[in-house]
Amino acid sequence: MSWNFSPMSGPWLATHIWDYYDYTRDKKFLRKVGYPIISSSADFVVDYLWRHPDGYYTAAPSTSPEHGPIDYGATFLHGVAKEVLMEAVTASEILGRDKHKREEWKNVLDSLMPYKIGRYGQLMEWAEDIDDPDDRHRHVNHL
C-alpha cells in the first residue's frame, strides 16, 4: 500500500494523551493540555460519523488502516471512536466541564455500531463480512 486514508489517526493519538493522565492523575495536565485535545477529538468523531439506516453511528468512507479496502464501518474506526468518546466523557466529568457536549458524546457512544463476528469466527474489520480467510497479515488492527 503506497498511501493510507485514516482520519481516525488524530483521535487515536489523543487516546495516548488520556493514557498519560490515567497513569499520572495530573489534573493540571488534563485541564490545560489533555482535555482540549481529547474533547476536540471527540467533537471530530461526532462530526465525522453518520447515522446508518440501521440506527447505528458509523463512518464512510472508512478503512482498515493495515488492510486497505475502503468501505463503511471499519471496526478500527469504531474502536477509536468508542475509546476517545469514553475518555472525553470521563475527562469532562472529572473537570466539571462541557455538560452539553458530554451528553452528545454519550448519545453517540450509546449508538455506535457494535463489533461483529464474521463467518469464520473472526472479529470483522468492516461492517460487511468481507474479510479474506487467506489474508496472512500478522494481526488484526489495534483496537
What are the language-model segments listed below?
Residues 2-15, 19-24, 32, 75-143:
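Active-site core of glycosidic bond-cleaving carbohydrate-active enzymes
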Residues 21, 25, 29, 65-68, ...:
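Short coil/turn segments at secondary-structure junctions
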Residues 22-39, 43:
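Hydrophobic alpha-helical bundle architecture
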Residues 26, 47, 69, 133-136:
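Short, flexible coil/linker segments at or flanking structured domains
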Residues 36-53, 108-120:
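Long, well-ordered core segments of solenoidal/helical folds
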Residues 39-94:
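Acidic/histidine-rich catalytic neighborhood
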